[in-house]
C-alpha cells in the first residue's frame, strides 16, 4: 500500500498530469509524469495515481491490477523526484501478465519518463 501522502486523489491533479505531463508507454501500461517546474511543489513527496479502465476486465480484475501496481510502486516511489505527479494507465494486457513482467514494464516506463523529463528540463 502506498503512503497516504503519496496517493493522487483530486481529479484536477489527474487532469493536469494527463494533459501536461510527459508520456511514455510500454506493452502493459503507459505513464504520464509532471514535474513541479518553476513553481513551489504542492507537496514534498511524489504523488502517484492509477487509471484502470473497464477494457482491462471486470471489477475483480481491475482491482487486482491496481493492487499489483500499487505494490510495485511502493518500492519505487523513492526514485521519483519530490513534488512530481505520476499517473499510470493500465492496458488490457496488464491483466494477464506475470508480476515480474509487469515490474519490468513499469521499470521501462519509469526510466523513459525520467529521461524525457530530465532532457526537457535541460532545454
Where do the protein language model's features map onto the residues?
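Positively charged, solvent-exposed patches that mediate nucleic-acid binding
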Residues: 1-123
